[in-house]
Amino acid sequence: MLATSTLNRVMIVELGLAALVPGALVGAHYGVQIARPLWGHGSDAGGRRTPWILGGVALLAAAVTGAALAVAVMADSFAIGLGLAIVDFILIGFGVGAAGTSLLALIASYTPDARRPATAMLVWLMMILGIAITGLATGRFLDPFSMDRLIAVTAAVALLATAVAVLALAGVEKGTLPAPPAGATRSFETFRAGLADAWHDPEARRFTVFVFVSMIAYSMQDLILEPYAGLVFGMTPGETTTLSGVQNGGVLAGMLLGGLGGTAFHRRFPAVLKHLGVTGCLLSAAALLALAGAASGSHAWPLRANVFALGFANGLFAVAAVASMMALAGAGGPTRTGLRMGLWGAAQGLGFGLGGFLGAAAVDAMRLAGAPGSAAYAGVFLIEAAGFTASAALAVRISMPHRVPEGGERRDAAAPRWNSRRAPA
């Protein structure tokens, strides 16, 4: 949050830099997410995931503090500060990738099938809660603003986050992972073999494409929704900022419904995760079509309700995607969970970063081509809707693994082609 929001604002407002500078730095942080499969493989081969999680958090904390220092240096020497910032944002990406991939693999290893929707909901809720608390606390302590205060507050938040991570993980991981096959090491050859195995699994491959396409669609409106509301509906900066809160409220509602509903109905309807994911994608497409239709500029359009609906659909889709990720990650066996989770984390990071860039670039390109501003924004929303529709079509074709209960084989009533691979306990 500090790296992608607070430092972004300081570079643009306080230092007067072009938005391209922080945009490129944040893009570098997303770009290195392609290394996530390697971090996941390391935690698989190492026998324990906790060291990778804490190591990633420590690297993230140091890099965020370094990034704040680099921004302060920019005020006196832009070239030196930019060089430091590039290194720090790359390290931020590595820290996020190592910690996030290993944490999700740990959660997937310990969570029973029936509890995965609720677990995915809790993970997202805790992430949003952490962002909210950090934003409120740092906003209070950063005023009156100075570069020295920025560095001090960032360092304090980083130190506190590291301490919380250490306490939260104490005693969670009992024992070690099952021993890898004889001769398996952390070598690059072993990593390549594991990655090839995951890619040759049709369900894992389809899910990778699904994550990439859906995250592009998910993030394309990230940088354009507030400008759209200001241009088409004449909203003030304060009003468009509250619109973001309305959307996040919808996300929370969708996650709660998806998490609780998915957990409650998982045993009776094994295909509930697939149905939630498809429903979330289609509802997201419908909400985006409505936003595109509202570009005519009718101030009577219920924009807040439309944005809440978009957030709700996104939340429903997100919970189903994370829970499905946990289930599919375990299908490769406990010594491949981290690598598979890393593969999908890489697809998520690259898709999210690319989507935000493409959304903003598409608006600029259409306006340069002579399209009115409202039509340009509507065009991007239509592209997003098409992306979510394609994601729904991909999700329908993904067969989720399931455990076979003692009473006999359980099949997915909604999908005769549901596979019979067993996820490990």
Stretch-by-stretch model annotation:
Residues 22-44, 245-258:
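Central cavity-lining transmembrane alpha-helices of secondary-active solute carriers
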Residues 54-79, 279-298:
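C-terminal ends and interior cores of transmembrane alpha-helices
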